[in-house]
Amino acid sequence: MGFFKTLFTGKEESEEDKQEQQKKNQFDVFKYDGIQAQRIGKLEYALECFRRALELRDDMETRLIYANALVSANDLEGAIEQLEKVRETAPDNKEVLLNLAELYFQTEQYEQMEDICNAALQLDDSEPATHYQLAKMYKAKGDMISAVAQCTLAISKLDEPFAEAYYLRAQLLMEMQQYTEAEADVDVILQLDEENDEYLMLKGECCEALQKPEEAKECYTKVKTINPYVTNAYLRLGAILMAEGKKDEAAKIVEEGLQLAPEELKNVNGEYSNVEQEMHDAYKAMDPLGFNVGI
């Protein structure tokens, strides 16, 4: 490099220039070694490479990659620290703000999360994801009305259905015992993904609350087919069957669930000799919304 610089400029490369070039080369080596290490699953080595690279140069792209690697290592506080540094140099980067909001949510730092979301709204109040993040925050804080309002704003700002916001709003409405409205939201997202076991479970719970046991049974049966390891589907289906006086059929469902996920259902009751008591315990344990199907 020094030879060519001398050839074309007539000047020899200074010691300072040489050191700067060496520093740049070292930075590139650490950065791309880190990227390669992360790709092949050597996370600790990757983190060390990114740390060393950032000691040599403050590079936003590398810092973002480093933050992502820290999330993979479950070091959320470390990732927050890196993204906050990026935010200092790029305060208008909406993606960084939304990623920060999610990390603050996961670490239950709701005040900081709200500040970040408000900053994002000042940049662009038409961004649905910001309202969705606020909805999650309000739900976590127990402010269901504000959470529903933010879900509604998120939904209204997107031309196509915002599945996550509909699903969250349906959950909120269920907790608020607005079962008809909750079912309407679930129906919207089931049109988008009719085999989503989470949507089907919530649809079943709506149907139970609205005294539609046959529809609820259809939902839970479909969940068992799609994902046989959703233990709650067996419990809720068994509870409905018990309420209908179909003790043998309920016992069969419970046994089926036990064979597929014995450890999860074992927590309901240590002994399985008494199916009726078992279903009482199971439904009580798995019914946080307080539905009553007559058991």
Residue ranges with predicted function:
Residues 19-61, 65-75, 102, 106, ...:
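Alpha-helical segment of the N-proximal tetratricopeptide repeat
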Residues 51-55, 84-88, 118-122, 152-157, ...:
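Conserved structural position within tetratricopeptide repeats
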